[in-house]
A protein has these predicted regions:
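Nuclease and nuclease-like effector domains acting on nucleic acids or nucleotide cofactors
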Residues: 1-91, 95-133
Length: 133
């Protein structure tokens, strides 16, 4: 994985060898069939690719085709600007905004690793989709 700043966005981009396992970890087959996870966009959104190669962003919660937005920039080919404060960390809202969490409250923000992030995204999406059903 490579990560760092690209313009005003903090990106975490997965290596091609990681994409399949990361896509499985986020259970995209359940919520976005036919898409693969390419990376994270400023911690709040996944960057996903469809089977035609088009790139989109989608909120981590809720995951669903109705929330896809075409990515408005090309993924950088040049190195990202590293930021040691964030290497290996993903910002997570303890109570996601969708569930009434405050995005500016310091006590609602936690920094987790990639594996924890996958687990949290899956758990909260399961909660969202079960309530929606």
């Amino acid at each position: 994985m490579k990560e760092g700043w690209h313009d005003d966005n903090y990106l975490q981009l997965f290596d091609s060898s990681e994409i399949s396992s990361v896509t499985e970890s986020y259970r995209l087959d359940k919520y976005l069939p036919g898409f693969s996870v390419v990376g994270l966009l400023s911690w709040d959104d996944l960057i996903v690719r469809d089977n035609k190669g088009s790139l989109f962003s989608v909120p981590t919660v809720p995951l669903g085709p109705e929330h896809l937005k075409r990515l408005t920039f090309q993924l950088p080919t040049s190195p990202l600007i590293s930021d040691l404060r964030f290497i290996g960390k993903v910002k997570w809202y303890i109570k996601p905004i969708l569930f009434g969490g405050n995005p500016t409250a310091a006590d609602n923000i936690s920094w987790v690793d990639s594996a924890q992030h996958c687990q949290l995204v899956v758990w909260w999406n399961d909660q969202y989709h079960s309530q929606k059903a």
